[in-house]
Amino acid sequence: MLVSSHLERLLVFVFEFIFIEIGFPPCTPRPVSTSSKGVTIESSHSDMATSSLHFASCDTQQAPRQRGASTVNSSSSTKVDLKSGLEECAVALNLFLSNKFTDALELLRPWAKESMYHALGYSTIVVLQAVLTFEQQDIQNGISAMKDALQTCQKYRKKYTVVESFSSLLSRGSLEQLSEEEMHAEICYAECLLQKAALTFVQDENMINFIKGGLKIRTSYQIYKECLSILHEIQKNKLQQEFFYEFEGGVKLGTGAFNLMLSLLPARIIRLLEFIGFSGNRELGLLQLREGASGKSMRSALCCLTILAFHTYISLILGTGEVNVAEAERLLAPFLQQFPNGSLVLFYHARIELLKGNLEEAQEVFRKCVSVQEEWKQFHHLCYWELMWINVFQQNWMQAYYYSDLLCKESKWSKATYVFLKAAILSMLPEEDVVATNENVVTLFRQVDSLKQRIAGKSLPTEKFAVRKARRYSASLPAPVKLILPALEMMYVWNGFSIVSKRKDLSENLLVTVEKAEAALQSQNFNSFSVDDECLVKLLKGCCLKNLQRPLQAELCYNHVVESEKLLKYDHYLVPFTLFELASLYKSQGEIDKAIKFLETARNNYKDYSLESRLHFRIQAALHLWRKPSSD
């Protein structure tokens, strides 16, 4: 009972910390899977031939003909052979990457209840649509599709007696007991389980769904561990299988992605997860994904896209901002060649340009990403989010407002965050410009609290943060107390200063804005928010100065915040986040031991503040990178 209780709570933590913490739709075409630690696969591609990425050779134009040729009448119960399932799923992936989303679904739909790979591909696209739209009907459709997919995969799994079912897969007998088709069924079943678990968490916030979702993750995790052992056995005995490379690709994708995702979690959560058998190893995860990417399986592209998501998105939001742009560019190059107008490919291309500091180029690519297709508006919303931030970085406030307004009107992902950002951006404009928009800033801030939502039983951290900040405009107060630089504060929360650090001109312009706010504060009458506002300005000023290579002045700003700790009344998050910035500053000056000491102080001495989990993610990433040299 104790283990079950731990399992329930800890698996909820996994989703709270990874799926919820990012607070924005994922950028990869499918959720990631599970892993095992301590089993290192010797790579036959140790040099990670990122230039040797293999795409499915199937011609997307031949999809209808192939479907008719490779299968039998759908009215029969005949199973589709493994070769046909793999080929058509590869074609569907190419269609998806070419923005032909409906074509991909229609190719897979007729055989989704007969073929495990048709079922996996079809349900994955439906689930992705549900996650991106956040419409309740789409979520229900996704759950239904994934339930059917699990039933289809179950048809192909090896059947065992009641007695045998009490033992693990490998202890039931020798490797020869599993046919090649049954091995693939295990991989497909594990992938479907994990996706269904994700939707179970999103669907409702009751405890029963928590337990159901947690057990699905646990089962998926165990299947991947067992498949990894099978993979090693096949390699050891040099057994011949026609589609071994596809099975290997599935194992590398699942174990690699799960290793990578679990390694991101704060140390205290990892220790608890290890108690019930979970573990994560970042180097092993990246190695497995790189090996999968350099293979020729259908999942090679998915391994690449997972690494790209890690480098271009996760490393920035949940990390230190130290991104392996070079590897991201190498991985993306063959995608750009084969899918030059693919929305997902263009999105990654724009993200890479953004991380390099090429904001103008990124802006153009994001706009192109919007223009190339109308079928899935959800990709537009991803681009609007990025375009909004680019304009914030450039302080083009009216244009930033335009994109924030589009998000408020069209996207359901986080209305509270969108409305808060719209109000925050309007707060940066002169009053006459705000009047021209026909918006009321106070009214917008007051709407935030009513728009917050819960996922997996938890509020989104950024929404909770927005709600707390918006309380200064509450109707219960005698008068609103204006927020200071709210758009730049949110920019800091999303690690935007890391991107701006590549551009001296933008950092200088931001410093001017911050110093104007600093001067305005000094001329205002003292109130209960004054110390908090002053400390926020000092933190933002320190970030600008650090980006401009003025470390001594930056350190003075940061120290002011830390020394004001006992005077803060509301924004207690400022001190631990400032300690993180001090650590980053010392690390840039080569004082690694001092930097680590500040990280540990921020991690161990503070709790129950806004965005605590986000900071713990960043601390974990920094400790991982700074304590030893890394080739990531």
Curated annotation (Swiss-Prot):
Enumerate the UniProt keywords alphabetically.
Lipid metabolism, Repeat, TPR repeat, Ubl conjugation pathway
Q: TPR repeats at which positions? A: 343-376, 535-568, 576-609
Which GO BP terms apply?
cholesterol homeostasis; lipid metabolic process; negative regulation of cholesterol storage; regulation of cholesterol efflux; regulation of cholesterol metabolic process
Q: Give the top-rank taxon of the lineage listed in the UniProt record for this protein.
A: Eukaryota
Instruction: Kindly give the SMART domains that the UniProt entry links to this protein.
Output: TPR (SM00028)
Q: Which InterPro entries match?
A: Iml2/TPR_39 (IPR019412), TPR-like_helical_dom_sf (IPR011990), TPR_rpt (IPR019734)
A Pfam family it matches: Iml2-TPR_39
Give the family from UniProt.
Belongs to the TTC39 family.
The task this protein performs is described as: Regulates high density lipoprotein (HDL) cholesterol metabolism by promoting the ubiquitination and degradation of the oxysterols receptors LXR (NR1H2 and NR1H3).
* Name listed for the protein in its UniProt record: Tetratricopeptide repeat protein 39B
User: From which organism does this entry originate?
Assistant: Macaca fascicularis
